[in-house]
Every structure is written in structure tokens, then in C-alpha cells.
């Protein structure tokens, strides 16, 4: 990459970081202005368009980065698990670390998941589906259950984790510790329940081949 390209990428990075820094519990992405973001990044407003078509493209880039950042951290957590440790507890701890270190990135995902922009909703949904798919892959490999079971389990776990994450944004250290313990318990219940249901379906199939009743 040439010097000019490096400088352009550096400025683009500054714009993304400037936008993230201006988000807060009281301020959503929709309230940000191009001028404010450009000023925070140290460039002229007109220079913004050399890097993004408009503010929405900047926001979509931020959504993609937030999702990727979270998935990368969870991959690292699974590597730590491979060296020993509780799967669920390590994953919960890693997720809470992400929220503690990147609250605005998680706020962006939460808010735009149900925001007014169809493009933003689709982008967040896509990131969540990536997250679910990677977790389902891991569960399928570790638990040796069919894909349909691991996808259902992964979706349930991600739904609960994101809900807990929203709560974690606005509570203190001790309350967050209690939330983590509750989340670990809930995820273990889902995990045990998924395995129990799978074993039950296996037993029913063995007794009556090809005839599994949905209850």
C-alpha cells in the first residue's frame, strides 16, 4: 500500500472512530451530523466524501466493524476454551469484556437492530446471523448434534446474551457480576435442555423410525 493510500485509510479510520466516540447512552447515530464527525476527525466536512458517500455509509461500516469485532473476540474465547476452562463462563466473560470496552459499538448494534432504517436493520440482522452461524458451527463440532438442533440452540443463546448485554450497559460493577452469574445459569439451562431434547428425539426415532412428533 502506497503512502497516499495509507493516509486515506488512516483518515477513514479516524472518521469511524470519531463517530463511535460521539455515541452515548443519550445520543444515537441518527443524531450525529457530518460536520461534527468531520471536525472530530480533524478534516474539512467536504473531505468526508472522499471516504464515504454519505453518513449512512459510515454508519453501515460501523455496524459491520462492531459485528466483526465481537465475532473475533468470541473466536479468541473459543481458543482459550480449547486450552481448558468452562465454555459458557469464558464466553460470557469475553462478551461482557467487549461491552465494557466497546459500549458504543454494542449500543449501535442494539439501536439499529430495530431502528427506522431498513438498510441498518438488515446490516445488524446480517451480523447477528453471522454470530449465530459461527456459534452453531462450534456447537455442532463439540456436541455432535444435527445442524437444526445447534442452530436453534445458538439462536436462543444469542437472543438471551444480547438481552443481557443491553442490561449490562447501564448497571454498576456488582450488578454486572450478578448479571453474569445469572446469564451463565440461563445458558447452561439452554445447553442442557437442547441436549436433553436431542437425546429424547433420538430415542423416539429409534422406537418409531421416521415418525417424530413435535410436542
From Swiss-Prot:
Q: Where is the DNA-binding region?
A: 33-52
Which residue range or ranges hold the HTH tetR-type domain? 10-70
* Listed Pfam families: TetR_C_46, TetR_N
Q: Which PROSITE patterns match?
A: HTH_TETR_2
The record's subcellular location field reads:
Cytoplasm
GO aspect biological process, one term: negative regulation of fatty acid biosynthetic process
Q: What are the UniProt keywords, alphabetically?
A: Cytoplasm, DNA-binding, Fatty acid biosynthesis, Fatty acid metabolism, Lipid biosynthesis, Lipid metabolism, Repressor, Transcription, Transcription regulation
Q: Which GO terms describe its cellular component?
A: cytoplasm
Where the protein is mainly located, per its record? cytoplasm
Q: Which GO-annotated molecular functions does the record name? A: DNA binding; DNA-binding transcription factor activity
**Keyword Cytoplasm appears in the UniProt entry:** yes
Q: What's this chain's function?
A: Represses the transcription of fabB, involved in unsaturated fatty acid (UFA) biosynthesis. By controlling UFA production, FabR directly influences the physical properties of the membrane bilayer.
Q: Which NCBIfam families match?
A: PRK11202.1
User: How does this polypeptide assemble, per the annotation?
Assistant: Homodimer.
Protein's name in the database: HTH-type transcriptional repressor FabR
Specify the species: Escherichia coli O9:H4 (strain HS)
